[in-house]
């Protein structure tokens, strides 16, 4: 009504696991499928993946750290807060989420710009680039001796401005390359922690976080996130993506399985659990507060920087 859109021109809303028709004659001819093959509504790739990555019960969250990053919860109703976004889940309920456009890609940027020597050393030794960088970062204490990284290399969406930019803050003469690596891993986790806090501010208790994507491969980043989130981090044996989720919904639609939640419990196989280290809670809580203060304080300078750059581009 607000946008004056004729409702009759919009498709009927269906559940993701409902049958909406059968394969057309044309599609059957092009694919070889029978015209008796049913078609279900299905769901978006992210939400189909979330369903089989731990987001099948309330009280859980999923951290997807790939090139970009998304952290999502699962709630009965939308979390009405302008700092995050909400979309309907493929199951009954809603997925509130926040994102970082430059999550894993920040790590790649660091590797290729500031850590070329270390990257080349890793390759000479036959070690994965990122695993080698994490070995260096492991020698640095939690909190990176006061070095902060703001992971806004590609700006922000709802938590800030598209003009936001990546920053290292707290540099001093005692910092080594390991500080820069660890601070980056912590900075991404601090940003996601802000979103988790919003979920819980609205009464949604998060008991565990499932971690998937390339960022979930290394022990150090998983442990940093467990310590900053103050939640156990669950990594999975396999990462099937949305294809498995849609396959299960189709199976449910035709009666091959009778409980989508129970089936998710069956297929979500845990690889390793990272328990939070309470010894790091103090430093990370205070640093997260300082991180948020830095973020908020820099919004005005970020806009000024963007105006200057645009003027002299």
Question: Which residues fall in each region the model found?
Answer:
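Active-site core segments that coordinate phosphate-bearing ligands/cofactors
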Residues: 1-4, 18-313
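Divalent-metal (Mg2+/Mn2+/Ca2+)-assisted nucleotide/phosphate chemistry catalytic cores
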Residues: 7
